A protein has these predicted regions:
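Periplasmic/cell-envelope proteins involved in peptidoglycan metabolism and beta-lactam response
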Residues: 1-281, 372-384, 488
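Beta-lactam-recognizing serine transpeptidase/beta-lactamase-like catalytic domain environment
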Residues: 3, 75, 202-218, 255-302, ...
Length: 491
């Protein structure tokens, strides 16, 4: 009896020991497998899991706001919906295209082309209008397209004043990139940065437990800047009204106006006609996108005579009371140069030459200065090189090489021909005369601020150089005042 109990005890001990060995072996295998998965395949499996249940979404912080000098908003960013399709889950492409096309104003074939591209994601229409979004959302629910049609939130640039300041502001493309004007010139500051965020999605790749909208609403960007311009929207409005009136009354090909504070170099208004609405820039010819104040060069004509008079007075080749004989026209190197009236003014002083803008007198003054000095003074007043204003596409203008100039070139340059300038260059030069002969760098950006309101950069007055002596400038200003008081400018 005792032997049977002993045998049974030994048998149990052996089986228990065997089970312990087996369980220990299994546990060891599990530990080894766990270690293998963690240490060897862990990164790959983790990435596989992330790809199965979500994706990394790039969030672009909304562009900074652009305002005028008084805080009036001129360019802002609004949240909008963008439409996409998952071609892998489209069961009837023709039906979907037929239903979508009239709601988003797109040809059915274009939508079919998007679907045929395949894959799990394709944009159909970016940054829809609100009524478009509401119409599509309703249709998607009613016709059960939720498996293949979805929306994502994106920022859309909006210009609340429509055409006002359009050629200065520019516009933004589909991918939030500035394509003209300040939007392009300061794109790196306005655009801010892109931030990656992981979103958990459902089987149709739609975000769950979070949304792109809430992510973008919370994420304001750490580096995008707001820009305050030197423009005064009130002055800008008056200028553009007058340009529209001039276009209607005179029917010119184009017209440009620049208003500048000569004591600071701040541009208070800058406008061109024809122009466009940056909210729908794609409806206009690219030619009207250009800011003619900085990108268009032309012969300045009699307006350049102020610079010639400044040079002549500074170099003392003339004095206000010096006498000239005006025959009505002069011949220079075989070229006839005559007065605007086509008549002779007889014996006149240099003051009269300036007051009446006599081409014959200025041609003689130009020849007295000579090609080198005439060109040197043009450069002193900023002609021949870009001003450096914060706008893209600025032209530098055209100046003759003095060594290549004939007498006729010198004479015609003295009356504002044989030279090409931008409207901004001309206004900058005239502002120097109004500023005691000191040339300032024009600027259209007043302040750049961070998202928290702190100052990132504050623009101020930048003195470039003195063009003529103060005494000379005072004499010149006295002559120019007579032009508008009793001379040719009175008209």
């Amino acid at each position: 009896m005792n032997e049977m109990k002993m045998d049974r005890r030994v048998w149990l001990q052996k089986h228990i020991l065997a089970m312990v060995y087996v369980m220990g072996a299994l546990f060891g295998v599990m530990v080894i497998r766990y270690a293998w998965l963690q240490l060897v395949e862990g990164d790959a499996l983790s990435e596989r899991m992330r790809n199965q249940v979500g994706y990394d979404f790039a969030i672009q912080s909304p562009r900074g706001t652009i305002t005028d000098r008084n805080g009036r908003e001129m360019a802002v960013s609004l949240m909008t919906k963008s439409l996409y399709i998952d071609p892998n889950h489209v069961s009837d492409p023709d039906a979907l295209a037929t239903d979508l096309a009239p709601l988003i104003n797109m040809p059915e074939q274009e939508i079919l082309d998007d679907i045929s591209a395949g894959g799990g994601f394709v944009w159909v229409k970016r940054r829809m209008e609100h009524d478009e979004y509401e119409a599509v959302r309703k249709m998607v629910r009613e016709k059960s397209y939720t498996d293949c049609v979805g929306f994502r939130d994106e920022a859309k640039r909006y210009y609340p004043n429509d055409i006002l300041g359009a050629n200065v502001l520019g516009f933004v493309g589909t991918d939030d990139k500035g394509l003209d004007g300040i939007e392009q010139g300061l794109d790196g500051l306005l655009k801010g940065e892109v931030k990656e965020k992981y979103l958990t999605t459902d089987r149709q790749n739609r975000p769950i437990l979070d949304s792109i909208f809430s992510s973008q609403r919370q994420y304001k960007g750490e580096y995008c800047k707001n820009v305050e311009l030197t423009l005064d929207a009130g002055i800008q409005f008056i200028v553009e009204q007058e340009l529209d009136r001039a276009m209607a009354e005179n029917n010119p090909q184009a017209i440009t106006c620049v208003v500048m504070n000569p004591k600071t170099g701040e541009v208070l208004a800058m406008a061109s006609r024809p122009s466009y609405n940056p909210n729908s820039f794609y409806d206009y010819s690219p030619e009207v996108w250009k800011n003619r104040a900085v990108s268009f060069i032309y012969e300045p004509g009699s307006t350049f005579k102020s610079v010639v008079a400044a040079a002549a007075l500074q170099e003392k080749v003339v004095s206000p009371n010096q006498v000239f004989v005006d025959p009505g026209y002069v011949m220079v190197s075989g070229r006839r140069i005559q007065n605007w009236s086509g008549t002779s003014f007889g014996t006149v002083t240099f003051t009269d030459v300036v007051k009446q803008s006599l081409n014959t007198g200025f041609a003689q003054v130009g020849l007295r200065l000579g090609a080198q000095k005439l060109t040197d003074y043009a450069k002193l007043f900023g002609f021949g090189t870009p001003t450096g204003i914060e706008l893209p596409g600025e032209e530098g203008g055209l100046l003759f090489n003095p060594d290549d100039m004939r007498d006729s070139d010198v004479a015609t340059m003295a009356i504002g021909q044989s030279i090409a300038v931008t409207p901004l260059q001309l206004v900058t030069a005239m502002s120097a005369i109004a500023n005691d002969g000191v040339l300032l760098k024009p600027h259209i950006v007043k302040t750049i601020t961070n998202v928290d309101g702190s100052i990132y950069e504050e623009k101020g007055t930048t003195e470039v150089r003195r063009t003529i002596e103060s005494a000379t400038d005072k004499t010149l200003v006295g002559l120019l005042e007579q032009v508008v008081a009793s001379g040719g400018g009175k008209k």
